[in-house]
A protein has these predicted regions:
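His/Asp/Glu-enriched, well-ordered alpha-helical/loop segment
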Residues: 7, 17-99
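Acidic (Asp/Glu)-rich catalytic clusters
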Residues: 1
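Helical hairpin unit composed of two closely spaced alpha helices linked by a short loop
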Residues: 12-15
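Short peripheral tails and domain-boundary helices/loops at the edges of structured domains
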Residues: 112-117
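Short, Lys/Arg- and Gly-enriched loop/turn segments at beta-strand edges
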Residues: 101-107
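Charge-dense, low-complexity polyampholytic segments
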Residues: 83, 107-108
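Composition- and surface-driven signal marking solvent-exposed, interaction-prone regions
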Residues: 17, 108-110
Length: 117
């Protein structure tokens, strides 16, 4: 299986452009989200990467972006039998996203993440 990794804030930091995530989404490609490193990013934050995608690619639903940051990443590294979703037998980390807009199912500038488990 082929997965496309994107680190949008790093892409902007280095190239001042983003991968064509709207096209990749419309084609049904498997995308996963990363942060790259501090040499090409101001901080390592998955929620910031997700907020960036939401602000630039408004047509991509939050549910898909969350999947890109969870299950798709686990599948890409071959760890989906342990991580990436709440399934019996798995032991995923649990991260709470606070200050999301539940009416529009979107992240806001105030959205933050907090690791619970």
């Amino acid at each position: 299986n082929l997965y496309w990794a994107t680190c949008p804030l790093s892409n902007w930091f280095i190239h001042r452009q983003y991968a064509p995530l709207n096209l990749m989404h419309s084609m049904g490609l498997k995308v996963c989200i990363g942060t790259d490193s501090l040499s090409s990013n101001h901080r390592l934050s998955m929620i910031d990467e997700m907020k960036c995608i939401m602000s630039v690619f408004k047509e991509i639903p939050l549910a898909d972006i969350i999947k890109w940051g969870t299950l798709n990443g686990a599948e890409a590294i071959g760890a989906d039998n342990l991580l990436g979703s709440f399934t019996i037998g798995k032991k995923p980390g649990v991260v709470l996203i606070e200050n999301a807009d539940l009416a529009t199912l979107s992240l806001t500038e105030q959205s933050i993440s907090k690791r619970l488990v």
